[in-house]
């Protein structure tokens, strides 16, 4: 079948990496695939695209005649049968798509790549309300949050209504979707997980030998405050560094919060913390023993399953429902439950210390993590996608 992925931008980012991975997998199975992006963020991913997967760059992120005309021409010339809208919340992409496909037999799947009932804007409102001591200003912030939530809910309903299928990343998000949007019987709603995005050829080289693993804890991801809360990773390590002198913490990623985090490390007097910046995480997955993720919310947590596929035992803050689809607590990783008191660095450190001092237990957890990660392999996820497309009577 002929498939066109649509993204807001095409540069380094989780959604974009998943898009490229799925595009390459569909192409491998004989489908004709292209990617339409409203603008080019950088050329890092573009350089990794195979020649048989064209990237079409529009005229900016806008609902314009130019963009509609360009997209319609692609739909006609390339005989596109399905558009996979990877930006399944904003109004603009679905409006452009539906104007472009008017009168054509083109199906649309919209995908929401985050936790259904929250996002960065809503969390920023929550955090501002928590910090506010002024009752009047607090009331204003509450109104702002209500408006942001209402607009987000309406936008999600709109995209759902104007798509043939709407996908969320976890079965646990289905009930959240119903509650958040007010759609009681969402017959077009499908739960579809993201795949491990590391090449199968690399996957076959996974290191599972405990002798080749290092005593290293890693964080992989963006360095921001609103969502990722990486300072919690550092606070947790603060309980561990002196007790485990042969272990180290490595932070892989970059972002606007990096300077604050580096200052936090200095203030705590920590010695074995390394900031690596943006890097391909492959070598870190190969050598690390544990992964620590302390986000306030996530869509799915791709770094968790990627790490698990290399035997990296995950320790994750249970702030979002989908993590319970990935980790079986105390079997292939650990989840620190979310409570009203918030993240407890000392309790997480105790969970990690119990494993750090017992290599035999770590080894069993590591093997179990690899086994669980197979559920999210590219081939398994592709089969789920193909099944969903077949149900829509798209292609053959």
What do the PLM-derived regions correspond to, one by one?
Residues 54, 259-278:
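Nucleotide-activated donor-binding/catalytic signature segment of Leloir-type glycosyltransferases, i.e.
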């Amino acid at each position: 079948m002929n498939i066109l992925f649509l993204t807001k931008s095409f540069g380094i980012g989780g959604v974009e990496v998943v898009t490229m991975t799925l595009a390459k997998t569909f192409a491998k199975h004989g489908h004709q695939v292209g990617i339409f992006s409203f603008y080019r963020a950088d050329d890092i991913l573009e350089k990794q695209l195979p020649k048989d997967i064209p990237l079409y760059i529009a005229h900016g992120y806008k609902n314009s005649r130019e963009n509609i005309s360009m997209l319609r021409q692609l739909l006609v010339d390339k005989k596109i049968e399905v558009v996979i809208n990877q930006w399944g919340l904003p109004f603009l992409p679905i409006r452009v798509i539906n104007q472009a496909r008017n009168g054509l037999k083109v199906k649309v799947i919209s995908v929401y790549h985050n936790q259904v009932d929250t996002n960065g804007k809503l969390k920023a409102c929550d955090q501002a309300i928590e910090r506010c001591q002024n009752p009047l200003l607090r009331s204003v912030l509450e109104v702002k949050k209500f408006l942001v939530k209402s607009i987000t809910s309406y936008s999600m309903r709109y995209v759902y209504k104007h798509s043939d299928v709407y996908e969320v990343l976890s079965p646990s998000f289905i009930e959240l979707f119903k509650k958040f949007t007010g759609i009681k019987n969402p017959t077009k709603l499908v739960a579809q997980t993201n795949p491990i995005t590391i090449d199968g050829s690399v996957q076959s080289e996974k290191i599972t030998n405990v002798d080749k693993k290092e005593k290293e804890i890693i964080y992989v991801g963006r360095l921001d405050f609103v969502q990722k809360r990486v300072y919690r990773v550092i606070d947790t390590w603060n309980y561990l560094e002196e007790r485990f002198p042969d272990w180290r913490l490595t932070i892989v990623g970059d972002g606007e919060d990096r300077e604050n985090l580096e200052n936090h490390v200095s203030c705590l007097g920590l010695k074995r913390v390394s900031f690596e910046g943006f890097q391909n995480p492959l070598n870190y997955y190969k050598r690390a023993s544990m992964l620590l993720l302390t986000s306030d919310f996530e869509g799915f947590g791709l770094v968790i399953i990627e790490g698990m596929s290399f035997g990296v035992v995950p320790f994750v803050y249970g702030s979002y429902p989908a993590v319970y689809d990935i980790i079986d607590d105390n079997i292939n990783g650990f989840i620190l439950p979310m409570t009203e008191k918030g993240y407890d660095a000392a309790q997480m450190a105790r969970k990690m210390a119990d494993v750090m001092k017992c290599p035999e237990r770590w080894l069993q957890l590591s093997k179990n993590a690899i086994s669980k990660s197979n559920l999210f392999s590219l081939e398994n996820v592709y089969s789920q996608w193909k099944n969903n497309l077949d149900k829509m009577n798209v292609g053959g």
